[in-house]
């Protein structure tokens, strides 16, 4: 179970469904590498607890992405999805991904340093090219700081 998992009564959950081309490879990446607990599945889809949110991976052709999103000095893949973690959990996940040999689109780094909304970020793709961003904040109160 993810370290950020909370009881279902505490908040609403986000659901995202997207395509992958191999459910076994998806189980290895989302389950073994990211540490997401598997939920229901059939022979054409599988659900995961993605850090207390539901993702549904369906067999099909993944969306095409391109580095068209400008954030600071970087072009990031669009579209992408991701999550926000507290900084200690973010650092632990970054170390886990590095130990697993995940190739980063944008390696773990700080952005907006010293500014409101200072955050740590990393971008990587699942084995099917679906881009994922994970942000880390010292305090979740800073997520919408401007």
Where are these predicted regions, by residue range?
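Core segments of cupin and vicinal oxygen chelate
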Residues: 19-62
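A short local loop/turn or secondary-structure capping micro-motif enriched for an aromatic residue
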Residues: 56-57, 63-67, 140-143
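Vicinal oxygen chelate
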Residues: 1-9, 12-20, 49, 69-146
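A generic structural micro-feature
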Residues: 8, 40, 72-75, 116
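Non-catalytic surface loops within mature trypsin-like serine protease
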Residues: 22, 52, 59-61, 85-87, ...
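Short beta-strand/turn micro-motifs at beta-sheet edges
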Residues: 2-5, 66-71
């Amino acid at each position: 179970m993810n370290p950020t998992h909370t009881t279902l009564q505490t908040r609403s959950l986000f659901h995202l469904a997207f395509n992958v081309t191999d459910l076994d490879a998806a189980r290895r990446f989302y389950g073994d590498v990211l540490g997401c607990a598997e939920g229901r599945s059939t022979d054409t889809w599988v659900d995961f607890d993605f850090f207390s949110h539901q993702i549904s991976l369906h067999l099909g052709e993944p969306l095409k992405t391109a580095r068209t999103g400008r954030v600071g000095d970087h072009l990031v893949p669009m579209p992408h999805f991701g999550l926000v973690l507290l900084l200690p959990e973010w650092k632990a996940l970054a170390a886990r991904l590095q130990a697993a040999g995940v190739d980063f689109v944008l390696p773990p780094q700080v952005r907006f340093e010293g500014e409101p909304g200072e955050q740590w970020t990393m971008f990587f793709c699942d084995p099917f090219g679906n881009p994922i961003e994970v942000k880390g904040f010292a305090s979740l109160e800073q997520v919408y700081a401007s």
